């Protein structure tokens, strides 16, 4: 974890501190040890090779969530801005039953996507009694704009993230352009949860048998409009 200190130009004093983490790789070999480290042993991530029916038929079930790593977060923001503006104009409010937090930690979107997925399936799986469970219980009592700070100040979870980030096969880029979001089944509804967005977005019905297929259909617009094929997806499924 790194703190970037920014000076106040007028007084020459420290005005703010920004928390920066190492970026996670979209790789089960990084994500699964992270879950074990934070006390979650009931689920694991597996690669989603393709969204075609043949590839999906080999995925374990039930499928609880999907983590999607997108290229070029700036273009993603441009694509999503009018969608959220329309939802706001329609007075759509964040669903009370969906756990969500605003991301204030740079490069931490992989862990935010994972934590959003885990937090919203606690009624379906055993999340254990480790550091994630303890953090989640505390985070539930805070506002969505306070939960990121709670995570940033949790030395155990920060260390677990850092260890997982260093497991990746790729070198850390100078500027991280990829961005993780998650799709999760909450009470039979598929939600898209993006820690850079203002609130979770309901997409329609889903189930443990069809979640990855449904999520694949939902994210198709990204794949069609981004001039980049560097996508990666992982499904969250029962641990073998």
Language-model regions, residue ranges each:
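Cysteine-dependent deubiquitinase/ubiquitin-like isopeptidase catalytic cores across multiple families
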Residues: 2-240
């Amino acid at each position: 974890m790194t703190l970037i200190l920014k000076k106040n130009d007028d007084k020459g004093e420290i005005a703010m501190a920004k928390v920066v983490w190492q970026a996670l790789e979209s790789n089960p070999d990084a994500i699964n040890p992270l879950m074990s480290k934070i006390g979650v042993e009931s689920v694991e991530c597996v690669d989603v090779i393709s969204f075609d029916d043949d590839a999906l038929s080999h995925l374990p079930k039930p499928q609880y969530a999907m983590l999607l790593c997108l290229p070029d977060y700036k273009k993603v923001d441009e694509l999503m801005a009018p969608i959220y503006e329309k939802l706001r104009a329609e007075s759509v409010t964040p669903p009370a039953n969906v756990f969500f937090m605003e991301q204030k930690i740079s490069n931490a979107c992989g862990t935010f996507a994972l934590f959003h997925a885990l937090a919203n399936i606690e009624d379906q799986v055993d999340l254990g009694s480790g550091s994630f469970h303890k953090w989640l219980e505390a985070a539930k009592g805070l506002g969505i704009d306070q939960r990121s700070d709670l995570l940033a100040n949790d030395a155990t979870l920060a260390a677990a993230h850092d260890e997982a980030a260093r497991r990746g096969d790729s070198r850390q880029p100078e500027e991280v352009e990829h961005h993780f979001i998650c799709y999760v089944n909450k009470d039979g509804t598929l939600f898209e949860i993006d820690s850079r967005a203002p609130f979770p977005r309901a997409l329609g019905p889903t189930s443990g048998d069809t979640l990855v297929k449904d999520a694949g259909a939902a994210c198709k617009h990204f794949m069609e409009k981004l001039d980049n094929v560097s996508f990666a997806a992982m499904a969250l499924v029962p641990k073998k």
